[in-house]
Amino acid sequence: VASTDVFVTCVLHVGSKSLSHVLAAIERTKDRLADAGAASDAARSQIISATLAYWSAHPGVALSIIEKLLNYSILTPETVINWALVARAGNTRGEALATAYVYEMVFNTVMKVTGRVRQLVVKPSLGAEETETRDREIKAMRALFAAIEDALASWATGSKDEMIEASEGEGNSEGERMVRRWGQRWLRVFRRRAAIEEAFLVEAEKERARRAEEQAQGGETEVEGLTQMDV
C-alpha cells in the first residue's frame, strides 16, 4: 500500500531526532494513522514494514513504536503475529525466526494480550458488560495462540511452502535444519506460554468461586444476625 508507506515514513522522518520525538509525532497523527490502519490488513502490515525499514539500524526503537501503535489500536496483535511469522518469515524462508527483534516483537505482543486478560480475570466481581468483555478477550487470546501454533508448526516440521520450494534434495541442508530447529524452539516457548495462561485462568476461576461463596455465606450470617435482633 504505497500511500500508507509514504505517510508512515513521513511521520517517522518528522520524529527521527529521538524516540520521544517520534512518539510525539505519532501522538499528533494517531487519528490519521488509525484511519490508514483501518483500511485493510495489508495497510496495517505496511505500517509495520515501513516502521522497521525506517528504523532498521535501531530495531529497538521500531519495537517501541509498534508497541505504541498497538496501544492506540492502530495495529492489532493478529497483524503483528502474521507479519512476523507468516510474511517476514516467509520472505526470508524462515531465517527471520533467528532474528532477536522478531522474537521480541512477537513475545511483547503476546504479553500485552495476556496481561490484559489477567487484569480482567482477577477482578473479584464484574458486571454483565465487563463479563462479556472478559470472555471476548479470553477468546481473542486463545485465537492468537492458535494462530501462532499454526504458523510455527509448519516451520518446525519443514512443511512450510517456502521451505518446500527452496528445498534441496531431501531438505536436509544446514539452512533448512536450522530453520526447523528455530521453529521447534519458538513452538516450545509459545506452547508453554499458552499452557501457563490456561492454568492462570483455571486458578482465577477457582478464586472467583471461592470469593463468591464467602460473600454468600457472609450475607447469610448478616441476615441471621438481623433476624435475631428483631426477635
Predicted feature residues:
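Long alpha-helical repeat solenoid scaffolds
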Residues: 1-231
